C-alpha cells in the first residue's frame, strides 16, 4: 500500500466514523468525538467521490446530524469541523461551521456509502436544554466592566485620506499611525484608542470617524511605530520635537478646534468573557458535573489585558516591551488564565522563565501599561500561550504507581499527570503486586530508563526488611522513599525499621498494611508506627490493609491517608470487578480457598461507601491510581472529580459553598492529586501547585472537558502533549485532532524539563555522575516533620470506629454511608470506549 503518514492518520477518522455510524444505526446518540468523526469521515468520502466542490461540502457538512442525534452539549461544543482531502484539482481545506445547526439533520448524508439501515427519527426524541445546564456553562455577573478606568480621555476626529483601508489596534500609539490618516497628531501624543484590548478600529478610504482616545498607562516610554515620539513622554516635546517629526515625515495633521472629554468605556460582561475569559464574580460549570466555580479575583487590568494575534496587544511598542535583554523578560507568558488550585480560583497571567513559574499576576509592558507585576515583562524573547477561556491546574501527581510497562507513562501524561512516584522493574510478579524498585542495580536501570521520559519520577525502594543494610543501600542508590507491602510481610518490626531509616534519611514510607492481621490488628501497626509520619496507601482497604478497619487510621495526626482510584467513587459495578483484579495482581489462585477468603476480606461495600464520605470531609487527603495493580493511571483526575460530583449530589454543598458556588469543594479535591501528595513526598517546594518558584508543570482544560480531556500539557515550561491535527494540513486544527506528544516529549527535551526525585544521601554520593543521567536530580525534603495538619483542605481527623461484624464505619459518631452511584458524570459523554 505504501501509505503516507497523513493517510494512516485519516484511517483513525474512518474507523471511529464507521463505529459512530454503527452506534447511531442502533439508536445510540453520539458524543462529541463520535460526532466529529462521523461528519469528518463522511466529508472525506464525499471528497473521494469527486463530485462536490469545497463550497458545496462546507454546506453539506451541516446537513448530516441534528441535535436529536447527539448528546447534550455537543452542538454547543463543536464550533468548527475541518478536514483536508484530495480533490480532482489538488488537496484543499473544507471548513464546516456550526455543523449541528438543525434538529433533524439528514441521515441519508450521515449514512451515505455505509450500507447500514437508517434508523427512524422516532428513536431520537429532541430535547432542548436550558443554557445553564450546558457543559462548561458560564454565568456572568450583571454589572458592566469599565476599561481603562480613571484615565484622561478625549474625542478625536479622524479621516482616512488614503485609497486603502487602515486598521489601528488598541495599544498602538495613535500619533504614529499611517500618514494617510488626518487628525490632530499633536493632541494624540501619549494616547491610544479607548477600545477593548486586542480590538481595532478600521478606517475605510475617505471615511471620517470620531474615536475616543485614552492616555497610556505605565511609565509612558514609547518605542516602535513610525518613530515620531520615541522615548519618555514629555509635555514640552509636543510642540517642538514631535511637531517637527510629524511635519518632516509628511504625516497627515489637522488641528482640532474643539476637544471634548470622552466617556468611560464599558463592556458587557458576556462580551468581555468571550474575549478574555471569565472575571471576578463570574461562575463556570465544570464539564457535565453539578460543580460550579466562581472567579475569586482577577489580577489582570481591565483594558490592559495581554492579547496575542494580528493587530492585537502583544506587539512591539505596545504590550511587548522594546529593547530588553532576554534575561529581563519572560520566556513564556500564559495570558488571561483561569487558575484552579488549592490556594485559590482566580484569573491571572502566568510568567515562566527557565521552566519555572516566576510570576502570577499581570504581564505586559510596564513602559506603556498599568499594573504590570514585577518580573513579568513581555519582550521580543517571550513566547505566548493564549489562556483565555481555559482553566489551568497544576500537573497531577500519581504517587502509587507500579512501573509495570513504559506505556503507562504515555497514558499518564495524556491525562494530566506530570509526576509519578512508585516502584517496579517491569511486569515481574513482584512489581505487578508492589511498588518496589528493590536494589541498586534496578534503581540504576529504572532511573536510566526514564531519563528521557517527560515526567518527574520518584522511585521507592523495598522497605520490608527487619534489618537496615538493604534499606540504606537502596536509599543511597536513589530511592526517594520506602514501600512496606504486605506481600513482602508488613510486620510491626518491618514497619518500625523502615520508619527509623526514613527518619534518618528524610524520606517517606508508603504503607500497604497486613490484610491478614497475621502479626496483629490495626492497633499493632499503629503501635509500631509510634506516632511517626507515614503515608497510608488505599486507606479504605479494598486495595489492601488491615481487614476490616484500616480506615480508622484517618483519625491520627501522623498518618497521611490516600485512596486508590478503583473504588473512586463507589458505584454499582465497583464491587463486582474487584475479585478478579485482586486475584491477578496479588498472584492468588482461585483454586485455593484461603486465597479466595483473603480476597473477599478486602471487598466491603460499607467501607467503600465510607471512603466516599471521608474523601468529601477531607479525612482522606489524597487520591492515586495503583495502576495496573487494580487502579487506572489515566483516571486519577477523572475519578477524583467523579467523586466530588457524586458527593455534592448526595451531601449537598460544603460549608461555605452554595448550590452554584463549589469553590471549597473544588479546592479540596484538586488538592488531593496536586499539593497534598507533593507535601507528603517532600516535593512541594518545586511541584504540586501553581505558585511562583515551582516548575511550570501545568495542565490546560476547556471548561466543558474539565477533568476528562486536557487540551495541552506544559512540562517544565515546554509543551509536551497537546491536541493536534493532521501534520500535513495547512493549519493545525484539521481532523483527526488527537492527543499527541509534542517537542517537550522528545528525549533530549524531556531530560531538560523534568526531574528525578531522589534522596539527599544519593546526591551526596554523586548519583548523577555515577548513573550518567541527564535529568535534573532533586532531593526530597521535609518528609518527616509533617502531619495531617499540613494537608491542604484535607486535614480532618474525626474519631473513627468500625464495627467488626457489620463493617459499619462511624466518624465522630456519625455513620459514613452513601449508596452506590448508578450514573456518573465524565463517563459516556466523553469517552469512545
Swiss-Prot record:
GO MF terms held by the record: nickel cation binding; urease activity
Urease domain mapped to chain residues: 395-833
Regulation of its function: The urease accessory proteins URE4, URE6 and URE7 are required for urease activity, URE7 supplying nickel for the functional urease.
EC number: 3.5.1.5
Pfam families xref list: Amidohydro_1, Urease_alpha, Urease_beta, Urease_gamma
Substrates-to-products reaction catalysed: urea + 2 H2O + H(+) = hydrogencarbonate + 2 NH4(+)
GO CC annotation: urease complex
Catalytic residues of the enzyme: 586 (proton donor)
InterPro entries in UniProt: Amidohydro-rel (IPR006680), Metal-dep_hydrolase_composite (IPR011059), Metal_Hydrolase (IPR032466), Urease (IPR008221), Urease_alpha_N_dom (IPR011612), Urease_AS (IPR017950), Urease_asu (IPR005848), Urease_asu_c (IPR017951)
GO annotation, biological process: urea catabolic process
Enzyme class: hydrolase
Binding site for Ni(2+) 2: 483, 512, 538
Modifications after synthesis and translation: Carboxylation allows a single lysine to coordinate two nickel ions.
Free-text comment on the cofactor: Binds 2 Ni(2+) ions per subunit.
Binding site for Ni(2+) 1: 400, 402, 483, 626
UniProt keyword annotations, A-Z: Hydrolase, Metal-binding, Nickel, Virulence
Residues where urea binds: 402, 433, 485, 512, 629
Cofactor: Ni(2+)
Modified residues (N6-carboxylysine): 483
Pathway: Nitrogen metabolism; urea degradation; CO(2) and NH(3) from urea (urease route): step 1/1
Family classification: In the C-terminal section; belongs to the metallo-dependent hydrolases superfamily. Urease alpha subunit family.
Function field: Plays a nutritional role via nitrogen acquisition in the environment. Contributes to the central nervous system invasion by enhancing yeast sequestration within microcapillary beds (such as within the brain) during hematogenous spread, thereby facilitating blood-to-brain invasion by C.neoformans. Affects fitness within the mammalian phagosome, promoting non-lytic exocytosis while delaying intracellular replication and thus reducing phagolysosomal membrane damage, events that could facilitate cryptococcal dissemination when transported inside macrophages.
Complex formation: Homohexamer.
Protein name: Urease
Organism the protein comes from: Cryptococcus neoformans var. neoformans serotype D (strain JEC21 / ATCC MYA-565) (Filobasidiella neoformans)
